[in-house]
């Protein structure tokens, strides 16, 4: 089993975000209530930069299984779901294309990458 090395195992992260796939692939016009209600508790677990990086790594790995997921849709999820700053990987990063080392390093409300790598 994949482990996030953060507050939650990747299986839990994946399960909470699974309802967002229809929107992330462009099938639905807006994130479903189930998508938003899954992401809210996930966002609340983010307390540190490490928590954010771990969750974003899980999400990045999981979306590789869905070829139609588009970054432009992922980036739109926080607004209709009213998630502010706690899942920055949706706000700032292109999950499909960002190297894993960059996920979660430069984020809203968290410290920037100490090495300026991303």
UniProtKB/Swiss-Prot annotation:
<dbReference type="GO" id="GO:0008289">
    <property type="term" value="F:lipid binding"/>
</dbReference>
<dbReference type="Pfam" id="PF00234">
    <property type="entry name" value="Tryp_alpha_amyl"/>
</dbReference>
<keyword id="KW-0446">Lipid-binding</keyword>
<dbReference type="GO" id="GO:0006869">
    <property type="term" value="P:lipid transport"/>
</dbReference>
<keyword id="KW-0813">Transport</keyword>
<protein>
    <recommendedName>
        <fullName>Non-specific lipid-transfer protein</fullName>
    </recommendedName>
</protein>
<keyword id="KW-0732">Signal</keyword>
<dbReference type="InterPro" id="IPR000528">
    <property type="entry name" value="Plant_nsLTP"/>
</dbReference>
<dbReference type="InterPro" id="IPR016140">
    <property type="entry name" value="Bifunc_inhib/LTP/seed_store"/>
</dbReference>
<comment type="similarity">
    <text>Belongs to the plant LTP family.</text>
</comment>
<dbReference type="InterPro" id="IPR036312">
    <property type="entry name" value="Bifun_inhib/LTP/seed_sf"/>
</dbReference>
<comment type="function">
    <text>Plant non-specific lipid-transfer proteins transfer phospholipids as well as galactolipids across membranes. May play a role in wax or cutin deposition in the cell walls of expanding epidermal cells and certain secretory tissues.</text>
</comment>
<feature type="signal peptide">
    <location>
        <begin position="1"/>
        <end position="7"/>
    </location>
</feature>
């Amino acid at each position: 089993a994949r482990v996030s090395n953060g507050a939650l195992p990747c299986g839990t992260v994946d399960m909470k975000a699974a309802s967002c796939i229809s929107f992330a692939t462009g099938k639905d016009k807006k994130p479903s209530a189930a998508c938003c209600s899954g992401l809210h508790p996930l966002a609340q677990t983010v307390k540190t930069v490490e928590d954010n990086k771990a969750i974003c790594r899980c999400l990045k790995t999981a979306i590789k299984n869905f070829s139609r997921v588009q970054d432009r849709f992922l980036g739109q999820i926080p607004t209709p779901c009213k998630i502010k700053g706690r899942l920055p990987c949706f706000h700032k990063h292109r999950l499909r294309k960002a190297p894993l080392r960059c996920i979660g390093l430069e984020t809203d409300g968290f410290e920037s990458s100490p090495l300026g790598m991303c």
